[in-house]
Amino acid sequence: MPSASASRKSQEKPREIMDAAEDYAKERYGISSMIQSQEKSDRVLVRVRDLTIQKADEVVWVRARVHTSRAKGKQCFLVLRQQQFNVQALVAVGDHASKQMVKFAANINKESIVDVEGVVRKVNQKIESCTQQDVELHVQKIYVISLAEPRLPLQLDDAVRPEAEGEEEGRATVNQDTRLDNRVIDLRTSTSQAVFRLQSGICHLFRETLINKGFVEIQTPKIISAASEGGANVFTVSYFKNNAYLAQSPQLYKQMCICADFEKVFCIGPVFRAEDSNTHRHLTEFVGLDIEMAFNYHYHEVMEEIADTMVQIFKGLQERFQTEIQTVNKQFPCEPFKFLEPTLRLEYCEALAMLREAGVEMGDEDDLSTPNEKLLGHLIKEKYDTDFYILDKYPLAVRPFYTMPDPRNPKQSNSYDMFMRGEEILSGAQRIHDPQLLTERALHHGIDLEKIKAYIDSFRFGAPPHAGGGIGLERVTMLFLGLHNVRQTSMFPRDPKRLTP
């Protein structure tokens, strides 16, 4: 007599055969073989952002990530995400989908990449949880192109939840270190996608504006023989049998290009600062947007050109990136960025007077601390209703050796900083273009003349008066969007405690 287990097996076998026979959709779903460029295909993949009412009733192919999946009886709802856009997809038992296909779709791991064929259908009620609110995709085929591991280091829904909402409702949010440790996942969120698309827009607008103004884009060396700012905060690297340094700025080379008659130059590239500053706004490596320009009679010609460039960037961002701004504001609410035309300019002594009136004790030659910068930003916003302004005529004592002194006041300099929401985003000045005065100032700052000989020599053969400035890309992005930490606007941030990923 057969055992109970043998009897069960004999009963299961016909059921398996029957189930396989019932799976009439088995060719319509599954795990695809790895794409190794085996063959080319004429299949057209439609972008999720293009799934609109205009495509209603069309059959389309889409490649996207599985953001969420939810099984409900004989159907499964998926949210398919592609960058910052997403659409609801429905897999339901019917002519094109078997119950096995529905079960397969419901069990695809989050963040897996899938190819889906489906019919675009107009919905009667807007799908508020998706960017594509007027349509959904009725799935006919679904294949996994790249399977994600079942356990994610962070949940994307948690990563985009406003902190206030998480605190009020007791729901999970994701802390900064977890985000940065798993940066590739964090960068997939709609907020991160919006931040870095807007940041790309800043670079594009900077380049576009300056080229239209007649500037030439240059590239400068990042491995240099002497500290470009003359300070100690440099990274030393081994350079064959000598030591070299990572450039703190392209300053000296921008000026050399002006001496070489390029007249107006700019560059976009990495800047390195070996400062042990663990603050919300400091990085050891960031992207510098640098400008240098010859002028005719007064350095304000350059200062005003830079200010206008910033205004053109702000205008361009507000015109072209409203969707991204609104996406970031959902998670990090913020007042819209305000600026004036022409840009507000105050002299440093006027800023000191405002701070002293507010109870701050400062000497005439003291530099602004971060708290005082922020306070000044609030005072200026209250008085002038602008988030962007210039402080001019800084004390000479707090500026680099190559800064031109003010001929009318030896304690002041022809230098300026630009601010957004009470934080400095640009430092600039007229440069010393006379080799004798430059030598004197370098010695005053204790700089080894031998290490900057090529720089000083470049002024010995005739140099036009010139000025410029350097902007921190990550800070501009952070402050325009009203974010609170520069690590949110650095794709893979470097600070004194972080060297990976």
UniProtKB/Swiss-Prot annotation:
Protein name: Aspartate--tRNA ligase, cytoplasmic
Biological process terms in GO annotation: aspartyl-tRNA aminoacylation
Domain of life of the source: Eukaryota
Gene: DARS1
CDD domains hit by this protein: AspRS_cyto_N (cd04320), AsxRS_core (cd00776)
Catalytic reaction annotation: tRNA(Asp) + L-aspartate + ATP = L-aspartyl-tRNA(Asp) + AMP + diphosphate
Modified residues (Phosphoserine): 249
Record organism: Pongo abelii
Sites of N6-acetyllysine modification: 74, 374
Residue numbers spanned by region Aspartate: 251-254
Annotated region (Binding site for the 3'-end of tRNA), positions in chain: 411-415
Chain's role: Catalyzes the specific attachment of an amino acid to its cognate tRNA in a 2 step reaction: the amino acid (AA) is first activated by ATP to form AA-AMP and then transferred to the acceptor end of the tRNA.
Post-translational modification Phosphothreonine, affected residues: 52, 500
Xref: Pfam families: tRNA-synt_2 (PF00152), tRNA_anti-codon (PF01336)
Keywords of this entry: Acetylation, Aminoacyl-tRNA synthetase, ATP-binding, Cytoplasm, Ligase, Nucleotide-binding, Phosphoprotein, Protein biosynthesis
Keyword Amino-acid biosynthesis (UniProt): no
Main location: cytoplasm
Positions that bind ATP: 273-275, 281-283, 424, 472-475
UniProt EC number: 6.1.1.12
PANTHER family: ASPARTATE--TRNA LIGASE, CYTOPLASMIC, ASPARTYL-TRNA SYNTHETASE
Binding-site list for L-aspartate: 229, 273, 427, 431
Disulfide bonds: none
Single GO cellular component term: aminoacyl-tRNA synthetase multienzyme complex
Stated family: Belongs to the class-II aminoacyl-tRNA synthetase family. Type 2 subfamily.
